[in-house]
Amino acid sequence: TISENYIVIKPKIDTRYSIDKVSTHDRIEQSCLVKETLLSLVEEKEYGDAKHIIIEEGQFFPDLETFVLKAVEGDKKQVTVVGLDGDSNRKHFGQLHKLYPLCDSITKLKALCLQCKDGTEAIFSKRIIEGKQQTSIGSNEKYIAVCRPCFLNNK
């Protein structure tokens, strides 16, 4: 369970819905700390007081692996990382994949395919606008969740 002493962190690059809150696509919001790097948090009071650290959009933090190891193994914190394990080209995205062999557990959540709309689980993000860059912050105006057949049939 999440203790009362927790902090939520999101990357500074993510300004989609709010500058200082994390938000679901349905606009359910939670106050958070905003950082470019995670290690910059270590000297702050909020970090020292927190028992549980929740990292939103973990793929955007360049020091994710180092920070998580320090927090969990060095400082005995509980850490939850939320993020994408792959980009819209099905390539590793950030350092999330480096955490897999270190995790106590991994829960991979799936959406429903927004292309075939038949209840099939979606395991990929498909970019629906032009562009080749890996980092393009967006929501359903740029990406949709799709199943494997829809991803492969409509590249």
Describe the predicted segments one by one.
Residues 3-4, 50, 76:
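Short, high-confidence coil segments that cap the C-terminus of an alpha-helix
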Residues 54, 76-85:
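Structural recognition of the conserved hydrophobic beta-strand(s) that form the central parallel beta-sheet
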Residues 69-76:
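Conserved catalytic/switch belt of AAA+ P-loop NTPases
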Residues 1-44, 87-98, 108-111, 121-124, ...:
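Conserved P-loop
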Residues 114-118:
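Proline-centered turn/helix-capping motifs that create local helix->coil transitions or kinks
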Residues 47-61:
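Conserved P-loop NTPase "ATPase switch" module shared by AAA+ and STAND
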Residues 57-68, 86-93:
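Conserved ATPase-coupling elements of RecA-like P-loop NTPase cores
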Residues 103:
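Short basic (Lys/Arg) and small-residue
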